[in-house]
Amino acid sequence: MKISRREFIQTSAVASVAGSMLNAGTAPVAPTGNSLDGFAIARRHQLVSTPPTPNFFEGMLLGNGDVGVCAVVRPDALGLHIGKSDCWDIRVSEDIEKYVLTYKELLDLWARASEEAKRRDQPDMLHLESSIDFFREYTQKVVSSYRKPWPRPWPCGTVWIHWDPRWVQPVRQTLDPASGQYALQLALNDASAVSRNLNISCFVDWATGLVSVTTDTPAPFTAVNYVPDLDSATTAPFGFVESQVTPSTLPRPEIDARAGDGFAEFSCFQYFPAVGPTPELPSPPHSDRDRNFSLCGRLSGSWSIEGLTENQDRLAQTGATPAGTLGLREPPGIHLIGGAPQNFRLNLKVVTPRDILRERLEREAAGTNEHRPPIAITQDYAYSADELETLAHARKEAERLSVIDVGEIFHSSETNWKDFWSRSAVQFADKDLERIWYRNQYFLACCLRPGSTAPGLFGNWSTGGIGTAWHGDYHMDYNCQQVFWGVFSSNHVEQHAPYFELCQNMMAMSEKTAKEKFNLPGAYFPHSVFPVPSQINPYPVPPWAYQISETPWSLQSLWWQYLYTQDVEYLRRAYPMLRSGAQFLAAFVQKGTDSKYHIIPTVSSENWGFTVDYKLNKDCILDLALTQFLLRAVVEASTVLGADETERARWKEIGDNLAPYPKINGPYGEVWLDVMDAPAEWIYNIPITLAPVFPGEQVGIGLREEQLEIARRTARTVRLEGGNDVVYQPWIRARLGTLDLDWFKSQVAYCMLPNGIANDRVRQSGGRYSDSTDFDFMMRMGVWVENFALPGVLNECMLQSYSGTLRLFPNTQNLGAAHFENLRAAGAFLVSAAFDGREITQISLLSEKGKQIRMAKPWSSALRVKKSRDASAVSFTTDAGAIIFSTESGERYLIERA
């Protein structure tokens, strides 16, 4: 049955209901008179390359925030590597839990190890957890589950669209970040010497996640092959010398295909057991937490199926897939053979049980006018039999969408992209900076959306072993959080929804750890976690599992969302998590004889490990800064909500009296250290010594400026190995007003891949790395989605508001002329301003919640404030170089020279 455009749009819109409910206050605002067209500017920054580009890391990245596609071009084919945010091998071997010591028992073990080191006359020994035999034995025991190859993101397979390279040559490929459309131009020169061009178009539909591939004229494609990923893992994740587990493979995927009148269809079903094998239980039974995914592809035209039964039989075999001559045998899959040139259309749909459940919940939400909290799906949810019927659902969706004109689908998707780009826009005279901002906003939109699973280290792009290092998991010591650093200032609050759901899913585990292991109230957040049903702490491993900073860091952006939106109803949902973190920290700190609160013992991220008698495990600067951040946030949150008055007083007392930041007189003057008694001039992996600036947000321009000198000196002289700081370090410099944008561009360029993404690349030996280190070893692990936060660095150069004072263009060294529209400021203000390279030339702001505004004076001369609506004057006061005035909700204000 032909589906009308209206019916299609109505059906597609259901997928966006929860997001709109979550962010009703963040809809695009009416443009100002000098409005920037973000969609048009994004279109100027297309990615263009000359194929072939067969390598994954040359491939063009597409996505809709859930489904991800990496498009690669060989001389003989276009390949689409398909991934999805919630497609994971979810197995966890839970046998380690019985070995995990309580915190008191761990401290006793640490004390014994310290005595052993001193007995050996090695009082300066580092990493006791791996250097002392009995401590190493414990460490290896509790790390055994993490050393297994699972869990990990599971690729959804690869589609290869083949042509005869004698007659067809790929010429040019482009990716339009404005609309997410990928285009490949082919030159056709057939045996009759007739030449023409053929254009392939591919996009991932914003609303439905449909992967669409079409041609503009009949295409001489010889075959379409689908190759599912198979579990043949034999090595452990990066970070361990070797795996101590005999590989136990996932069940093989089930494939099928059929050809009909004017179409062909192929499918893959992959079952995911939730329980991993252990020596005691090598073949775990099915459980109610098991999951799966299904992929269905539907081709228009005439196709024949080749070798299906043989390939199904091969997949039914147990053990490794037998290799042919030289190991080059075609992997088992689906092979569809084409004939004469024909109009080409391929629809691909991937479905998980989460999709089916979410669609039902969104339909129910759309059918009521009641205010409901955003939909959240717990990771240990037991899916019903209907929700597990993903194959039938995928087939139904592929068939439904195949009868809708592809132009209608693309138009609907493009409309959603236009809405995305309407939320904020920037324009730089320096087009390199502009390109960084727009391309990375595009990449963020490809891996973040309300309702999807938060991206792990490598997001929703993977194939084979790519994207599986460290299990592709959530690292809570910056990697996971960094993805979201810029979403608020960019006015994409909706993109934070997956992280909020992640924190909700970590709460039970974190509260259990605090209670059962630490014997303390509240919640202690894990170092590493997976989007899987298992509720055990997957990495209770010394030393990194004992970084106290990870608890406040895990919760930080929950407070940011309130700070930037002033949404009290949201705060009511976030507050229990914020409070739990504060309760743990308040119970963990110790008051010293100096009347200061100390954090002892703790661990500095990836530096010293456990040391003798806590020598380098005292008062980590990251712990102090983030603990202060969270306690001050919870004091304010509890005041807003009128809650926990008694605890509030203690939180404030601790926050106001934490130990001073560790420091030392180094060769360049006084600088901060990561921990008490650390040596000067250490080479760090992250700019941990700048934690009071960021992420702590305790020191900055106009904020505790008595510490600005030491902060800027530390930033200027800190030694960093690279690989983890292409966003982190310049962000801090921008906060201090010392970022040279030319230097910033050079750092991004150093980490750039051909497909426009900046990956993690080592920069310096002498610390953990040596001259024999391959400086590119992380560049080939996967798509480091953490670096998509690069636009946030530029936002910080143009607008800062975290301190309570709004500052325009606080960092302009080699910035050049710049103009931004609707960047979001703390206090729920949408700000627009322009800078001509010398001074600020225009300012306007929209007040969403009617809060008072404090703005650093943009000019030394007199100024006036007026309402945009009727040009009526607004009175203001001045204080310490700032203007202060009240605002009305929904009103736009102009600030001008008098």
Residue ranges and their predicted role:
Residues 1-3:
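N-terminal secretory signal peptides
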Residues 7-28:
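N-terminal export signals
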Residues 9-16, 441, 484, 500, ...:
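Short, well-ordered alpha-helical packing segments
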Residues 31-538, 542, 560-562, 579, ...:
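Aromatic-residue-lined binding/catalytic grooves and analogous aromatic/hydrophobic interfacial grooves
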Residues 40, 456-457, 498-501, 516, ...:
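Beta-strand segments within the central parallel beta-sheet cores of soluble alpha/beta enzyme folds
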Residues 56-94, 129, 133-137, 471-495, ...:
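C-terminal capping/lid segments that line or modulate ligand- or cofactor-binding pockets
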Residues 456-474, 521-571, 586-653:
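The feature captures the catalytic groove of carbohydrate-active enzymes
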